[in-house]
Regions:
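Active-site-proximal cap/loop segments of hydrolase catalytic domains
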Residues: 1-137
Length: 137
């Protein structure tokens, strides 16, 4: 997820395409939109966005704030009901990439959470990935 997005920001010249699965696209919005019961644990893991210096750092490393550096086609996969990474993380990176004129495919399974567990969604996802890679590799 996040590592794919970060790799696309920093190493687009070495990649042909990228597939982001339930990735954090902006740490500040991720922490803001994470459910209350998980937020404090995520702050320990990633940093506390309420601290101005940490907030600035989190904004700086967030792929959504660096889409101009992404030059590879991107496939973004998300589950609408993801309790770990809010769907807004996928929606905002897709919107930013599209607004910047970048190539982006988006698959949001409305009946899934963090990853695709249902066979019909896994099958559709795998077919979409094959098409994406055939087109961009």
């Amino acid at each position: 997820g996040y590592m794919v997005l970060a790799s696309a920001v920093h190493y687009s010249d070495r990649l042909k395409a990228a597939i982001d699965i339930v990735g954090i696209s902006n740490f500040v919005t991720f922490l803001t939109n994470t459910q209350d019961y998980r937020r404090d644990l995520r702050r320990v893991e990633y940093g506390d966005e309420r601290d101005p210096a940490m907030r600035a750092f989190l904004e700086e490393i967030s792929p959504n704030n660096n889409v101009e550096k992404i030059s590879v086609p991107m496939f973004v996969a998300q589950g609408e009901n993801d309790p770990r990474v809010p769907v807004t993380e996928a929606e905002q990176i897709v919107e930013s990439l599209r607004n910047a004129g970048k190539t982006v495919w988006y698959m949001n399974a409305l009946n899934e959470g963090h990853g695709y567990r249902k066979k019909e969604n896994r099958d559709l996802y795998q077919q979409a990935v094959i098409l994406f890679l055939e087109q961009h590799l």
